[in-house]
């Protein structure tokens, strides 16, 4: 049976050996070049392939059409992936008649994604395992073919658990590969409601936060012990690494991070105490805890800290253009909740941000981005992160004022993008789910879905193509000029302060605000073309949390990424949205102040939006990039969002002239 293999690390080597032992013919192996910044304690797939006389390749992008064509020419019967670090495109997966299979180091559906070995230790799990599953477009989501459980011992660290996983993988492949070869396998679909997903870890994720319980910190030490980079802390500005530790149920009133004793080296934690058994000062040698204390100059009562003492860092300056808008004002609230951000904002109004105007770390100027170009350029230069949130994003305006949409959404934003290139500033740019247009994929994927729009004589697409072209310009600046960027694509975010009822009165608002206005005024709810179009509605709090994590950019994981931010579980048609909103309205304590419900009315899109309008039937995001880059998933149910949005708007209505 001919196979093409994608492999890396020890698991890649043992997977190749297992295939050869089972009688598979390996036509080619795809692997990675080693990262010089990574400690290579594992076997070399490239060396093994060379020794076995198998062609081996390490392309930067195996999903490039040229490589897809070359793999197709190999005519594989089956494809295997053993710890290959990149997603393999569906075009490649479909080349093998018997399918494609991946070896994953966890008990799927738990711990999908990156670094499951480390994450199970960080989280204090007592069991993990290996899973062989069928590969599909979504990472680690295909049906399970075989699974083997292993116990995690209390004294296991990353390397001992790695060896256990390798041993289990050999057993699993030895048992399963012959069955795949003969087409005799039983597949079990994964339970999506049990799935968890984790992103990759970086050394910066491993600093010891002493306010946490000692057991949590001990698990961190276990998870990143040598040959991983280790857990670390600081004494003043001196960094040191903890290689091994023990938990002590020490009852102490000492502040977390305080040295309780130096022999043994015992540190107070949020709960209990952590003994540092072995460690290393700076780039020195490994030594036992009491010697480390002496080297670092520690005495009883000394304080450790998670960051260098001199880096009580300057607040990150964030420039938000369009700060009074729906996303801008909620994001401002989230940033000011922390103590390390300074927010600079510009907008043509301030009603939504009035609650921040006296905040010492919020600086607002009322103005228009098309007029205040000098102010904007100065503040792009001054700030660290730029979010240009100004745009016309209401569908009726696409057909009513297409040129104004282009001028504001494209031309003005292009100028800001070029300022970011000029001053080498990080830009977080709001793309849109609209760029996917009439894409027919079940899930809209940032990296693989086609962006499909209608003909030129349908001006409703001017917003979509303006945003798409800016996405491409930003991407090109990233590739050619080193622009640090992240593109995020909101999928139907909803919540309080989404537009306002006055905007809805002139038709210039999003769907839920328009529907609320209909209920408030006792006018029929208009269902455009029957309201069967489906969307995935996302609570503003979920969306803002994802956007906040993009700004935080832990480990620079968001650089150069496109990230959908949406809730694929909250899918509903516009008609269903209207029905849910109506039910919430009828139960609201202020209901008696408003006129009777006037019913639903079906209208044609051309009569509502104008003749240049086209709609799309569905728009569901893949959120695998959000899982991978942000460790994020949406949590808030659509009904809760509807209830809170409705309540907010009803309480803004002047009830003095309403019936009681």
From Swiss-Prot:
Annotated region described as Dehydrogenase ArnADH, given as residue ranges: 314-660
Residues engaged in binding NAD(+): 347, 368-369
Top-level taxon of origin: Bacteria
Binding site for (6R)-10-formyltetrahydrofolate: 86-88, 114, 136-140
Binding site for UDP-alpha-D-glucuronate: 393, 398, 432-433, 460, 492, 526-535, 613
InterPro entries linked: Arna-like_SDR_e (IPR045869), Bifun_polymyxin_resist_ArnA (IPR021168), Epimerase_deHydtase (IPR001509), Formyl_trans_C (IPR005793), Formyl_transf_N (IPR002376), Formyl_transf_N_sf (IPR036477), Formyl_transferase-like_C_sf (IPR011034), Lipid_A_modif_metabolic_enz (IPR050177)
Cellular component, GO, one term: membrane
Active site, per annotation: 104, 434, 619
Keyword Cell membrane: no
Molecular function terms from GO: carboxy-lyase activity; UDP-4-amino-4-deoxy-L-arabinose formyltransferase activity; UDP-glucuronate dehydrogenase activity
EC code(s) of this entry: 2.1.2.13, 1.1.1.305
Protein's UniProt keywords contain Acyltransferase: no
Site positions for Raises pKa of active site His: 140
Pathway(s) of this molecule: Nucleotide-sugar biosynthesis; UDP-4-deoxy-4-formamido-beta-L-arabinose biosynthesis; UDP-4-deoxy-4-formamido-beta-L-arabinose from UDP-alpha-D-glucuronate: step 1/3; Nucleotide-sugar biosynthesis; UDP-4-deoxy-4-formamido-beta-L-arabinose biosynthesis; UDP-4-deoxy-4-formamido-beta-L-arabinose from UDP-alpha-D-glucuronate: step 3/3; Bacterial outer membrane biogenesis; lipopolysaccharide biosynthesis
Keyword list, A-Z: Antibiotic resistance, Lipid A biosynthesis, Lipid biosynthesis, Lipid metabolism, Lipopolysaccharide biosynthesis, Multifunctional enzyme, NAD, Oxidoreductase, Transferase
A single BP term in Gene Ontology: lipid A biosynthetic process
Sites marked Transition state stabilizer: 102
Segments for region (Formyltransferase ArnAFT): 1-304
Pfam families: Epimerase (PF01370), Formyl_trans_C (PF02911), Formyl_trans_N (PF00551)
Catalysed reaction equations from the record: UDP-alpha-D-glucuronate + NAD(+) = UDP-beta-L-threo-pentopyranos-4-ulose + CO2 + NADH; UDP-4-amino-4-deoxy-beta-L-arabinose + (6R)-10-formyltetrahydrofolate = UDP-4-deoxy-4-formamido-beta-L-arabinose + (6S)-5,6,7,8-tetrahydrofolate + H(+)
Function: Bifunctional enzyme that catalyzes the oxidative decarboxylation of UDP-glucuronic acid (UDP-GlcUA) to UDP-4-keto-arabinose (UDP-Ara4O) and the addition of a formyl group to UDP-4-amino-4-deoxy-L-arabinose (UDP-L-Ara4N) to form UDP-L-4-formamido-arabinose (UDP-L-Ara4FN). The modified arabinose is attached to lipid A and is required for resistance to polymyxin and cationic antimicrobial peptides.
Complex and partners: Homohexamer, formed by a dimer of trimers.
Family: In the N-terminal section; belongs to the Fmt family. UDP-L-Ara4N formyltransferase subfamily. In the C-terminal section; belongs to the NAD(P)-dependent epimerase/dehydratase family. UDP-glucuronic acid decarboxylase subfamily.
PANTHER family: BIFUNCTIONAL POLYMYXIN RESISTANCE PROTEIN ARNA, UDP-D-APIOSE_UDP-D-XYLOSE SYNTHASE 2
Protein name: Bifunctional polymyxin resistance protein ArnA
Native source organism of the sequence: Escherichia coli O139:H28 (strain E24377A / ETEC)
Gene symbol of the encoding locus: arnA
């Amino acid at each position: 049976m001919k196979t093409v293999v994608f492999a890396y690390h020890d698991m890649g080597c043992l997977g190749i050996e297992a295939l050869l032992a089972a009688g598979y013919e390996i036509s080619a192996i795809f692997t990675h070049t080693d990262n010089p910044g990574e400690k290579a304690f594992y076997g070399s797939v490239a060396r093994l392939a060379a020794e076995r006389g198998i062609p081996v390749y390490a392309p930067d992008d195996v999903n490039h059409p040229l490589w897809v064509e070359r793999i197709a020419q190999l005519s594989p019967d089956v494809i295997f992936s053993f710890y290959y670090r990149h997603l393999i495109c569906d075009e490649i997966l479909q080349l093998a008649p018997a399918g494609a299979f991946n070896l994953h180091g966890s008990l799927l559906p738990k711990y999908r994604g990156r670094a499951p070995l480390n994450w199970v230790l960080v989280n204090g799990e007592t069991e993990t395992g290996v899973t062989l599953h069928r590969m599909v477009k979504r990472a680690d989501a295909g049906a399970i073919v075989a699974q083997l459980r292993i116990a995690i011992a209390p004294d296991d660290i990353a390397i001992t658990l790695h060896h256990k996983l390798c041993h289990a993988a050999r057993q699993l492949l030895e048992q399963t590969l012959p069955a795949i070869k003969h087409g005799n396998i039983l597949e079990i679909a994964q339970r999506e409601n049990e799935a968890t997903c984790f992103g990759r870890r970086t050394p910066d994720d491993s600093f010891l936060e002493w306010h946490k319980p000692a057991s949590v910190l001990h698990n961190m030490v276990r998870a990143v012990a040598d040959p991983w980079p280790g857990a670390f802390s600081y004494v003043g500005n001196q960094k040191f690494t903890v290689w091994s530790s023990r938990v002590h149920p020490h009852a102490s009133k000492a502040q977390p991070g305080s040295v309780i004793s130096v022999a043994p080296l015992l540190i107070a934690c949020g709960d209990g105490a952590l003994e540092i058994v072995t460690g290393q000062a700076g780039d020195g040698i490994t030594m036992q805890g009491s010697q480390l204390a002496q080297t670092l100059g520690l005495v009883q009562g000394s304080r450790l800290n998670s960051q260098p003492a001199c880096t009580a860092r300057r607040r990150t300056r964030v420039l938000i253009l369009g700060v009074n808008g729906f996303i801008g004002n909620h994001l401002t609230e989230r940033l000011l909740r922390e103590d390390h951000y300074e927010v600079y904002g510009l907008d043509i109004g301030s009603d939504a941000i009035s609650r921040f105007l006296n905040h010492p770390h919020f600086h607002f100027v009322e103005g228009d981005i098309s007029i205040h170009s000098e102010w904007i350029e100065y503040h792009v230069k001054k700030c660290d992160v730029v979010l240009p949130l100004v745009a016309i994003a209401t569908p009726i305006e696409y057909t009513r004022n297409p040129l104004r949409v282009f001028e504001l959404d494209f031309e003005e934003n292009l100028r800001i993008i070029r300022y970011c290139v000029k001053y080498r500033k990080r830009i977080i740019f709001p793309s849109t789910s609209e760029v996917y247009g009439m894409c027919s994929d079940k899930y809209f994927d940032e990296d693989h879905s086609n962006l499909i729009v209608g003909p030129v004589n349908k001006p409703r697409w001017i917003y979509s193509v303006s945003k798409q072209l800016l996405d491409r310009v930003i991407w090109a600046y990233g590739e050619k000029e080193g622009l640090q960027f992240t593109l995020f694509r909101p999928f139907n975010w909803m919540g309080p302060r989404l537009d306002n009822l006055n905007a809805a009165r002139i038709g210039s608002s999003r769907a839920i605000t328009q529907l609320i206005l209909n209920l408030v005024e006792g006018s029929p709810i208009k269902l455009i073309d029957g309201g069967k179009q489906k969307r995935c509605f996302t609570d503003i709090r979920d969306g803002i949390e994802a956007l906040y994590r993009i700004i935080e950019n832990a480990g620079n994981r968001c650089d150069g990424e496109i990230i959908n931010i949406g809730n694929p579980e909250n899918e509903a048609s516009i008609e269903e949205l209207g029905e849910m909103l109506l039910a919430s309205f009828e139960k609201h304590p202020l209901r008696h102040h408003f006129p009777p419900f006037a019913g639903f009315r079906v209208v044609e899109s051309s009569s509502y939006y104008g003749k240049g309008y086209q709609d799309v039937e569905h728009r569901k995001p893949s959120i695998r990039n959000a899982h991978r880059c942000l460790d994020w998933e949406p949590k808030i149910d659509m009904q809760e969002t509807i209830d809170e949005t409705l309540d907010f708007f009803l309480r803004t209505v002047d009830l003095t002239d309403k019936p009681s």
